[in-house]
Amino acid sequence: MRDETGETQDLEAEEIHPLFHGAPGSTEFRKLRKRLVRETRAAIETYDMIRPGDRWLVCLSGGKDSYTLLAVLHELKWRGLLPVELLACNLDQGQPGFPATVLPEFLTQRQVPHRIEYQDTYSIVKEKVPEGRTYCSLCSRLRRGNLYRIAREEGCQAVVLGHHRDDILETFFMNLFHGGRLASMPPKLLNEEGDLNVLRPLAFVAEADCDRFARAMNYPVIPCDLCGSQEGLQRMQVKRLLDEWESRSPGRRRVMFRALMNVRPSHLPDPKLFDFTALMPDMSDFREKDVPILREH
């Protein structure tokens, strides 16, 4: 929100979005909140995510990351720094034990425009996935298809996800170790149909900060393993590896993420990324000069 002079109010202004009602008053929390807002805003600007007047479908699973995403985006909008319309969306996929009333009550109490949709994709996944295999891959594909459909129905131009810096790093190493390719989650992506952007505004945010924020705000976090399926073994192994590196060398994740933003195609052996055939030395000037012959003694 801006004052009469047009200046953006400081984050510590008394007027706050209802999503921040009950926020701790500690210096530590204020620093965390400012850091989340600063890093999210930086990602939005770096990857040119904003097109004024657009409508964003903000996906809310009930996990710590999506709560953080929702709160920070509304904070930016509240401060006049995000000129888009926000619509929160939860897709209830029919997982057993999913608390169907938690998110509608949470969003209504905090005056957040939202849409709750029920689609029993859980039964489809149970039917299609062999026993002992993880549900995550098929479940995410079905969820993505439904979210794209909802975005179109609601007139949204972007689907906004809560993936953070750690998710991006983990995906990079999973592709490196198990997929044989250098790829991860881009902060901004155009879907195959070309009608929707997929945005990840938390791309610069650490998972630990999302966890601290959601805990401090006492948001009603819903566990992600209600279906009985755990995260894929590969991702868990990569997460443990990154944790070990971080404990041995604090700040390692930050350095690795900076490397993902500093790619040099000419220093990688992929001929599709760089025209190595054009790297031919020009010997014309060299041949015209008298070059002394070195003789062995």
From Swiss-Prot:
Miscellaneous comment: The thiolation reaction likely consists of two steps: a first activation step by ATP to form an adenylated intermediate of the target base of tRNA, and a second nucleophilic substitution step of the sulfur (S) atom supplied by the hydrosulfide attached to the Fe-S cluster.
GO molecular function: 4 iron, 4 sulfur cluster binding; ATP binding; magnesium ion binding; sulfurtransferase activity; tRNA binding
Organism per entry: Paracoccus denitrificans (strain Pd 1222)
EC number in record: 2.8.1.-
Cofactor remark from the record: Binds 1 [4Fe-4S] cluster per subunit. The cluster is chelated by three Cys residues, the fourth Fe has a free coordination site that may bind a sulfur atom transferred from the persulfide of IscS.
Binding site for [4Fe-4S] cluster: C136, C139, C227
Cofactors, names only: Mg(2+); [4Fe-4S] cluster
GO biological-process terms attached to the record: tRNA thio-modification
Any Pfam family matching the protein: ATP_bind_3
Keyword terms of this UniProt record: 4Fe-4S, ATP-binding, Cytoplasm, Iron, Iron-sulfur, Magnesium, Metal-binding, Nucleotide-binding, RNA-binding, Transferase, tRNA processing, tRNA-binding
Reaction equation(s) it catalyzes: cytidine(32) in tRNA + S-sulfanyl-L-cysteinyl-[cysteine desulfurase] + AH2 + ATP = 2-thiocytidine(32) in tRNA + L-cysteinyl-[cysteine desulfurase] + A + AMP + diphosphate + H(+)
Protein task: Catalyzes the ATP-dependent 2-thiolation of cytidine in position 32 of tRNA, to form 2-thiocytidine (s(2)C32). The sulfur atoms are provided by the cysteine/cysteine desulfurase (IscS) system.
Subcellular location per the Swiss-Prot or TrEMBL entry: Cytoplasm
Cellular component GO terms held in the UniProt record: cytoplasm
Main location: cytoplasm
Subunit structure: Homodimer.
Listed pathway(s): tRNA modification
Enzyme class of the recorded protein, top EC level: transferase
Family designation: Belongs to the TtcA family.
Designated name of the protein: tRNA-cytidine(32) 2-sulfurtransferase
Motif PP-loop motif: where in chain: 61-66
